[in-house]
């Protein structure tokens, strides 16, 4: 079977590599037991592939065959910090694949169904932002097919094999496309393009079709009910009372009751299983109950003013932000620690450094750059806060990667400054400006925001917010909220002496499963020390 597939396309270079690497495992990749064999041999794919994708050979003869191939995403590399056995299995089990189909229909030549790829660990669906190729265009490995809007950013999706784009299944602007859902068809021969003009993608639920055949049992039940409807009505009347939360009524009965402002709960059904029918509503109205229920509702309706509103559709980033933050507040036991830090010395050091920067033609250093550096060094000093909770253990990270919250017109992004504890202030500033610009242009790639271990959110400088509590960015265990600096009158050295100093409020949100209160306080003490003695950050 393996040789038959390889002979079909000379461009399956990765299959040849797998055969040379481990013939036995590669053969299993072409069988129906593909996934079990992959679980134990992830090292093969880590060594050979710089992307993760699953290609399924559909309907080759009478069986289905599965293999690894590629939709290059230029982003989800298995060598990244996010990659590991668990993440790899998630990609393998996902439906991100391209499908080479040997159709059972003689009208369809061999083709490839390209599915919506999973471009980030949290991605479950995506949108087609823009098609860069048209139907009929020739495609080559490395060429960009389309731009996919993920839960984090807009990512270019590249083609892995040479051929022709025969059919665009999901048009430009299509939204909420599930991972694995077919978005396009490619063929090897240009003459085959026209054969896919009216093509409908194959269903992934095909194997479940035979299981749905027990449907004929439904008509049997209906036939039994109809002749016994009269006696059953008397028996089932009492049973309608307990199910107060759900009232069974015919559509016509519901409409009639609604038009006359009659609550269905006040009507006793005489139909099968206590079902309320039209005659029951008419009998209720005829009994004189109509007036007592209709008049109050008319008075209420007359006093309710009409609301003027507009419905704004959710963007992909908005839906993901809502989902992740709701998950965070529902599952992470937050607690908050606030401290005031004197920033006079930090502002003085910043002025000196900016003088050097201007003289050398460099960019100015911001307060946020100093805050990121101080947070990174404090994490190195108190590594318990640079951790993540799992059900089996607490994972403490050796890298200090700081996510920085950036608000854009499209939504909230959190790009990451990696190894911030090892970088200088000017380097941190350059990276933050570069990532913020990419976020505003909606051009962040997965490697720009994945792998963070701690988050900093600053609403003080840009918006003048004095103090706030931020929501933890899962799976991290803490987030630092930066408020604005303000001048305060503080006691001087003498009994009647007073000085003016600038103070900034910072609040640390902690996951109590990971960080105990004393540990969080220890981290804030270290952070405050770096802010109030900024020269120590340069050591």
UniProtKB/Swiss-Prot annotation:
N6-lipoyllysine modified-residue sites: 152
Secretion signal, residue range per the UniProt entry: none
Molecular function per GO: copper ion binding; dihydrolipoyllysine-residue acetyltransferase activity
EC number: 2.3.1.12
Domain of life per record: Eukaryota
Catalytic function, reaction form: N(6)-[(R)-dihydrolipoyl]-L-lysyl-[protein] + acetyl-CoA = N(6)-[(R)-S(8)-acetyldihydrolipoyl]-L-lysyl-[protein] + CoA
Cofactor needs: (R)-lipoate
The protein, known as: Dihydrolipoyllysine-residue acetyltransferase component 2 of pyruvate dehydrogenase complex, mitochondrial
């Amino acid at each position: 079977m393996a040789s038959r597939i390889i002979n079909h396309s000379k461009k399956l270079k990765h299959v040849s590599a797998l055969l040379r690497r481990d013939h036995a495992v590669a053969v299993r990749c072409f069988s129906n037991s593909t996934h079990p064999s992959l679980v134990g041999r992830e090292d093969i794919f880590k060594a050979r592939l710089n992307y993760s994708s699953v290609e399924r050979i559909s309907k080759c003869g009478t069986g289905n065959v599965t293999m690894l191939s590629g939709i290059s995403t230029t982003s989800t590399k298995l060598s990244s910090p996010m990659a590991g056995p668990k993440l790899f299995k998630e990609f393998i089990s996902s439906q991100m694949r391209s499908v080479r189909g040997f159709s059972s229909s003689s009208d369809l030549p061999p083709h490839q169904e390209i599915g919506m790829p999973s471009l980030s660990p949290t991605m479950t669906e995506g949108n087609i932002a823009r098609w860069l190729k048209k139907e009929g265009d020739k495609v080559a490995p490395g060429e960009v097919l389309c731009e996919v809007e993920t839960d984090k950013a807009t990512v270019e999706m590249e083609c892995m094999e040479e051929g022709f784009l025969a059919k665009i299944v999901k048009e430009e602007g299509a939204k909420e496309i599930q991972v694995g859902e077919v978005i396009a068809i490619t063929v090897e021969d240009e003459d085959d393009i026209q054969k896919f003009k009216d093509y409908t993608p194959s269903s992934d639920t095909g194997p479940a079709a035979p299981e749905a055949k027990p449907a004929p049992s439904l008509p049997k039940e209906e036939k039994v009910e109809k002749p016994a409807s009269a006696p059953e009505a008397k028996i089932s009347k009492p049973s309608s009372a307990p199910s107060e939360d759900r009232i069974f009524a015919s559509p016509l009965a519901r409409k009639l009751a609604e038009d006359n402002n009659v609550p269905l709960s006040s009507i006793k059904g005489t139909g099968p299983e206590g079902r309320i029918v039209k005659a029951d509503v008419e009998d209720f109205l005829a009994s004189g109950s109509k007036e007592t229920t209709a008049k109050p509702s008319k008075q209420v309706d007359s006093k309710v003013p009409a609301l003027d509103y507009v419905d704004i559709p959710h963007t992909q980033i908005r839906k993901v932000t809502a989902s992740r933050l709701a998950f965070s507040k529902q599952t992470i036991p937050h607690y908050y620690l606030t401290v005031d830090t004197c920033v006079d010395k930090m502002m003085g050091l910043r002025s000196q450094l900016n003088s050097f920067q201007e003289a050398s033609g460099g960019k100015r250093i911001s307060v946020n750059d100093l805050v990121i550096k101080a947070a990174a060094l404090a994490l190195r000093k108190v590594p318990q806060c640079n951790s993540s909770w799992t059900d089996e253990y607490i994972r403490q990270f050796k890298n200090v990667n700081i996510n920085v919250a950036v608000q854009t017109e499209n939504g909230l992004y959190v790009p990451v400054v990696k190894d911030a504890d090892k970088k200088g202030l000017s380097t941190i500033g350059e990276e933050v400006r570069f990532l913020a610009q990419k976020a505003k242009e909606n051009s962040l790639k997965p490697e720009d925001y994945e792998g963070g271990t701690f988050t900093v959110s600053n609403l003080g400088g840009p918006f003048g917010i004095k103090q706030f509590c931020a929501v933890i960015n899962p799976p991290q265990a803490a987030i630092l909220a930066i408020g604005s600096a303000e001048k305060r009158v503080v006691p001087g050295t003498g009994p009647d002496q007073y000085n003016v100093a600038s103070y900034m409020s910072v609040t640390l949100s902690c996951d109590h499963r990971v960080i105990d209160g004393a540990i969080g306080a220890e981290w804030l003490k270290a952070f405050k020390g770096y802010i109030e003695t900024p020269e120590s950050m340069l050591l």
